[in-house]
């Protein structure tokens, strides 16, 4: 589901290249289905952040965000009265009632992890899993599931490692935002690409609060970060090329 959420972020940019409204809506519907099917609520929040961020950095942002919020408020009462709608509400993050034990586990994980982190505050510990607090988190499968990437980083590498981890992505986000200013026109394709990358990165940073950095997840967020760096470099090259072109035009004899 996390990979599908990232695909949603990319689709925010790619959809403008699809001229058929039917195909555009079908693509959005397929992505929505793929996002909903695993019933993993963390990527749902991440996808929502992507959409809000993308709209918020575009034209008529305030008006469109108000319309989006109004539509969401209207949708909840409608779901409550349609057949099967209550089941959907129960699955929603923050307001749903399904998997309450999952929320309890996450709360215990935060509480116990903070105790362990305080013992090795600056540089973390390689054997944090053997501590009594972490051993008490062993689940039925015999594993300790650290379902929060930031906590996992802090446990392994301490506050210094966590600051470097967060600072890396914050620097890239600021670089993307700065690069977007090189394209002042709201309908510029390059600016829209920056909006999509910034929204996708923000969504990922929210999603990894709820998931472990296992399998392809680190590959995804490092890859998106790399795309952000490439976008910032592209904007700088274009700006230098435009500056050089302007100077050469001024130096041409009349």
Feature map (PLM): residue ranges:
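Membrane-interfacial segments
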Residues: 14-18, 61, 176-184, 214, ...
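A membrane-periplasm/extracellular boundary helix in multi-pass inner-membrane enzymes
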Residues: 29, 35-38, 55-97, 101, ...
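Membrane-interfacial loop-to-transmembrane alpha-helix junctions, especially the N-terminal start
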Residues: 23-24, 187-197
């Amino acid at each position: 589901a996390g990979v599908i959420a990232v695909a949603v972020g990319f689709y925010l940019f790619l959809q403008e290249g699809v001229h058929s409204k039917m195909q555009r809506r079908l693509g959005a519907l397929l992505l929505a289905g793929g996002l909903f099917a695993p019933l993993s609520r963390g990527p749902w929040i991440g996808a929502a952040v992507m959409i809000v961020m993308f709209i918020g950095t575009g034209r008529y942002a305030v008006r469109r965000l108000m319309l989006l919020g109004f539509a969401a408020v209207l949708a909840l009462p409608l779901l409550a009265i349609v057949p099967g709608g209550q089941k959907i509400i129960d699955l929603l993050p923050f307001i749903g009632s399904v998997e309450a034990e999952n929320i309890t586990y996450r709360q215990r994980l935060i509480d116990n992890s903070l105790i362990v982190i305080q013992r090795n505050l600056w540089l973390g510990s390689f054997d944090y899993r053997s501590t009594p607090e972490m051993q008490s988190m062993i689940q039925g499968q015999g594993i300790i599931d650290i379902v929060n990437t930031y906590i996992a980083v802090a446990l392994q590498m301490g506050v210094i490692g966590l600051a470097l981890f967060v600072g890396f992505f914050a620097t890239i986000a600021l670089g993307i935002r700065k690069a977007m200013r090189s394209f002042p026109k709201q309908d510029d394709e390059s600016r829209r690409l920056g909006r999509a990358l910034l929204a996708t990165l923000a969504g990922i940073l929210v999603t990894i609060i709820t998931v472990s950095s296992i399998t392809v997840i680190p590959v995804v967020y490092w890859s998106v970060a790399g795309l952000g760096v490439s976008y910032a470099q592209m904007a700088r090259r274009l700006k230098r090329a435009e500056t050089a072109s302007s100077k050469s035009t001024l130096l041409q004899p009349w």
